């Protein structure tokens, strides 16, 4: 039942890197975990991080380093670094610790599942046909060089009385193959009829070595 599991968690440590890089003892682990969740929830709500695909949290000797993976680094940095400085101050107040921010630019946003899912959600919220949004996104992903893509939407589609799910698939998306580099993400579109859920799977190809996780974004700036 490979389709029932999360492709990211299934491949973490094999072809995917951990998104929290720290060690905590029995007393610290729960505190650190909750702090990571709060940091990610806080950043997700910031307008400057709307184009962010993910956040990697590292801890070292009382300091926290957060890497923001985004397709729009200029929006996060702000004019003369004003926005990133504000984020650092707000995170310092939230955690009570010194926080470093690093901005990693995503060179090919069409191949990032989170950015694709968020884009479909925004279109559905603007009352674009969900089928048109899905097919357009799939075409962009395949044109960018993906091996395969699958997109599923669920909810009261087009205002239907009964909720249902629809999905489209193009190419190969093997969920059981560990060496297959599958990117997966979800998003929600808030409509007048209720919440529409979006799931995106993108097959980026197979890794020749399944023991070396790939790097989804390269650091471009630090603050």
Curated annotation (Swiss-Prot):
InterPro entries: KH_dom, KH_dom-like_a/b, KH_dom_type_2, KH_sf_prok-type, Ribosomal_S3_C_sf, Ribosomal_uS3_bac-typ, Ribosomal_uS3_C, Ribosomal_uS3_CS. It comes from the Bacteria. GO terms for cellular component: cytosolic small ribosomal subunit. The keyword Cell wall biogenesis/degradation does not apply. The keyword Ribosomal protein applies. It holds the Pfam family KH_2. NCBIfam families: rpsC_bact (TIGR01009). This is Small ribosomal subunit protein uS3. It comes from Chlamydia pneumoniae (Chlamydophila pneumoniae).
């Amino acid at each position: 039942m490979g389709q029932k599991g999360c492709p990211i968690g299934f491949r973490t440590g094999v072809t995917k890197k951990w998104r929290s890089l720290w060690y905590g003892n029995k007393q610290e682990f729960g505190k650190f975990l909750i702090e990571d969740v709060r940091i990610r929830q806080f950043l997700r709500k910031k307008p400057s991080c709307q184009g962010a695909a993910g956040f990697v949290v590292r801890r070292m000797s009382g300091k926290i380093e957060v890497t923001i993976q985004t397709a729009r680094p200029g929006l996060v940095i702000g004019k003369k670094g004003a926005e990133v400085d504000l984020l650092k101050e707000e995170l310092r107040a939230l955690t009570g610790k010194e926080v470093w921010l690093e901005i990693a630019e995503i060179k090919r946003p069409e191949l990032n599942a989170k950015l694709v899912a968020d884009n479909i959600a925004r279109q559905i919220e603007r009352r674009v046909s969900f089928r048109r949004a899905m097919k357009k996104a799939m075409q962009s992903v395949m044109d960018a060089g993906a091996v395969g893509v699958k997109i599923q939407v669920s909810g009261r589609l087009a205002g239907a009385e009964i909720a249902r799910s629809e999905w489209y698939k193009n190419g190969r998306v093997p969920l059981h193959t560990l060496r297959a580099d599958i990117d997966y993400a979800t998003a929600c579109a808030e409509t007048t009829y209720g919440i529409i859920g979006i799931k995106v799977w993108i097959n980026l190809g197979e890794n020749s070595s399944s023991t070396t996780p790939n790097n989804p974004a390269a650091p471009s700036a630090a603050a």
